[in-house]
Amino acid sequence: MINNSENVQNNSTVSPQPITQNILIDRFNPTYWRIDGPQTMSFAITNYGNGFEASFRSRMTTDLAGISWDSYDSKDHKFLAYETKYSYSGVVWDFDIELSPSMPVLNNESLTPTLTVYYNDNGVDKIAYIVLFNYANTPSSRSAHIHINWDTVKAGFSATDSFPVTNIQQITFSAFTSSYNPHSSLPLSQAEDGYIRITNSVVTGANAKLNLSRVVVPQHNYGLCTSYDDHYDLNPQRIVDNMAALGYHGFINHYCGMSHYPEIIWRSDINRFQIPDTLVTGQDVINPCTRKWHEKYAQALHNANMQPVFGVSFEMYSLGANEFWAQRDWNSNLGKTGYQPPSYFFSLSDQNALAYLHKVFIEFADTMVTGGCDVNMQIGEPWWWYNTDTNLPCVYNYPTKLAFNADTGLYAPDLGTIYEAMNKTGTPYDEFKTWLRNKLGQTCQDIRTAIKAKYANAQVCPLIFFPSIRSPIQTLATYINYPSEHYSYPHFDYIMTEAYDWLLEAKLDLAHQAVSQIPTQDLGYPASKVAYLSGFVPDASIAYIYGFDKNKPYRTPIWQRIFGDMQNNVSLGLMKQFIWAYPQVMFDSITIDTTQAPNGFFVENTLYTPISDNTPYPPDIYL
């Protein structure tokens, strides 16, 4: 048994440490603002001139987004974060603001735009509202120069309320349209778009500057994964700057998410939001804020000599789901994930659902081109789902049963659970299982064809999850989710692979065996056309799913195996190994320094050695 302390290279005077330097930035630097709001809204914060633009789409009368500066940087790696300064005393802030025509004018009496200040006063959290028109040179307009002296600024409509500025946690601009009504939550007759632009920010006086930490490392060969659902609130430039500083270059794997990109439209006939039926209406399926964010992300990646791979899954977020398009089990129960709220899965036999999915891929490909990047798309992970609480496969929605009958003349049989299905043989069981497998493979090939029809030079790959196709017990899921003939080279330009379950079970031999054999020997890909995602470290909220105690130091032992896993695969000559994922690298302050520590990695200041075998996890980190 190896415990953590045996794998730590002690922080002594001779032990290497990350090399860092500090640079000075202005407080309220435009790259470090965030945006967030309710799930019914869409929003994005991106570069605009010498400042930022916060764009948003409101769909409810109560929709309001917050554009925030945090005094404490909780989003960045320890050696990439800006200095924490809660005191705003001595700070004078000048900036230009521009509100969209859909927003109220600055001195609107009932909906006056404000800067909300969250502060602490003698241990009590309080809120003050700075009414912006009181500090504007043109208070009756939507464009103005704002001058705020934090030593004298006052809150309230008439600027009469003093408040302390020595312990401010956060300041927030509010983004809303003139239809905003906090007392009546109703869907708008149609979505309303808006923006707030902050430019020409100048900060003077004491406390005007902040130290920004910058780790100094050479470039290395590992890639990194990002995800829109994790980073929708950040300026994409911030993410790219951080990755470049940490030595990442070349390919970056980006999951386009499933909960924030969809355009959703209020359907009064069913009294809920729903994604559009683009086969019927021709409407865009990605909301304009997501489109802008990804265009700016692609542009920033391109400028930093990085090439994104944009991945789209088969998941459908429940908030706007069209449940007629979803996979279902024999009892018509929806296939759904265990998250709250859950996501569902697009049926592979519903033509309207597939048209929607094709358009998602095409619209994300469009953003790559707008940003100056080559089109490179990852399909999936593609699969037929099964519900883990019942082990029932979700292969029975009506279009699937109809398509099977049309193709074979047979009726879809009850396969039972994913385990029972393997003991049911003969007609129509064998035909149904084979048909399901081929349907998945053909669906992926059809997506590839749709992308290449518009972008002939596009690179397209499927993502396969090794534990789902190689398990000790063969199940229906392992069979139908591995259409090897359809996935084989050269049907796709390359293949993306992953095996995180085995790393979390300390079965690194299985992961290495799979990545070294399945893509090349089974599917015929050259090693140089095999990419691999290594990870991940579960967040505290889901650590229990994998048996870890969130209150114990479980994270570093997992990192040791992630790096050991990748170390095992170096000799294979793979196209790229990606670390899954950016939020965990930021949270744990993971640094790769091939000069200071060619055989290890840093967690903050501490150097660790990888574990590349099946050494069990320390027993004290389990529940």
PLM features: residue spans?
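Polysaccharide-binding and catalytic clefts of secreted carbohydrate-active enzymes
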Residues: 339-454, 465-485
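Catalytic domains of carbohydrate-active enzymes, especially glycoside hydrolases
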Residues: 221, 227-278, 282-285, 296, ...
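Exposed low-complexity, polar/acidic, P/S/T/G-rich flexible segments that act as propeptides
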Residues: 178-213, 594-600, 604-606
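Extracellular ligand-binding interfaces
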Residues: 53-75, 98-156
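Extra-cytoplasmic beta-strand recognition segments
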Residues: 75-115, 172-173, 201, 602, ...
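The substrate-binding groove and active-site-proximal loops of carbohydrate-active enzymes
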Residues: 224-230, 273-288, 341-356, 429-440, ...
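Extracellular beta-strand ligand-recognition surfaces/modules
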Residues: 95, 146-195
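Substrate-binding cleft of secreted/luminal carbohydrate-active enzymes
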Residues: 169, 175-178, 248-262, 313-317, ...
